[in-house]
Amino acid sequence: MNIEIKKSIKPIKYEDAIKLLEERLLEINNGQKEDLIWILEHEEVYSAGTSYKEKEILNKDISLVKTNRGGKITYHGPGQLICYFVIDLKKRKKDIRKFITLIEETIIDSLSKFNIKTFGDPKNIGIWTDHKGKINKVAAIGVRVSKWIAYHGFAININNDLSKYKNIIPCGISDKGVINLKEIKDQDYKNLDEIIIETFSKNLEI
């Protein structure tokens, strides 16, 4: 099963990225294009998924983009690795829960290459780490499935501005924090994108 790998160097506007994903969704459904994995970085934006609530916005002055992905509200911006995808589950296993687990394993396995221990949480979607005795989210996941084609993706915090999360209740979870990789371990993460692509592609073929 062929997968197109796309990498964008310059930050991409959130709305432009979602438009491309939705166009690819239609093309895959019509048999015109192959699956897609897309690595990018966003311009600053707060995005709200289908289950967010107004009370999760602590600063009413922020600009908010509502989207049809699953999940609640989160922040995207420089220093964050975004991995979007459009994957036809009809060619694989038509099991949404297994696909979410596959995403979680992709992130966990990729970060383990940098000696960073992370884990999923059955009650709170995303990838977490225990840093100095506190549970913090290091990666957010948001997925939508249409006609058994999964799209949207996940975001890994590398060295982004964590103060931006003070304007919201990230992913609707108030009793846990948000962290980035640089705060966990100050090292070079420049090849994380390649590791993500390799691991994700391999997991999709299993």
UniProtKB/Swiss-Prot annotation:
Active site: C171
Disulfide bonds: none
Localization terms from the record: Cytoplasm
Protein's GO biological process: protein modification process
Lineage: superkingdom: Bacteria
Domain BPL/LPL catalytic: 31-206
Amino acids binding substrate: R69, G70, G71, K72, I73, T74, Y75, H76, A140, I141, G142, G153, F154, A155
Reaction(s) catalysed (UniProt annotation): octanoyl-[ACP] + L-lysyl-[protein] = N(6)-octanoyl-L-lysyl-[protein] + holo-[ACP] + H(+)
Enzyme Commission no: 2.3.1.181
Annotated site residues (Lowers pKa of active site Cys) in this chain: K137
Keywords recorded for this protein, A-Z: Acyltransferase, Cytoplasm, Transferase
Enzyme class: transferase
GO molecular function: lipoyl(octanoyl) transferase activity
InterPro entries linked: aa-tRNA-synth_II/BPL/LPL, BPL_LPL_catalytic, Octanoyltransferase, Octanoyltransferase_CS
Biological role: Catalyzes the transfer of endogenously produced octanoic acid from octanoyl-acyl-carrier-protein onto the lipoyl domains of lipoate-dependent enzymes. Lipoyl-ACP can also act as a substrate although octanoyl-ACP is likely to be the physiological substrate.
Cited HAMAP family: LipB (MF_00013)
Family: Belongs to the LipB family.
Protein name: Octanoyltransferase
Protein species of origin: Pelagibacter ubique (strain HTCC1062)
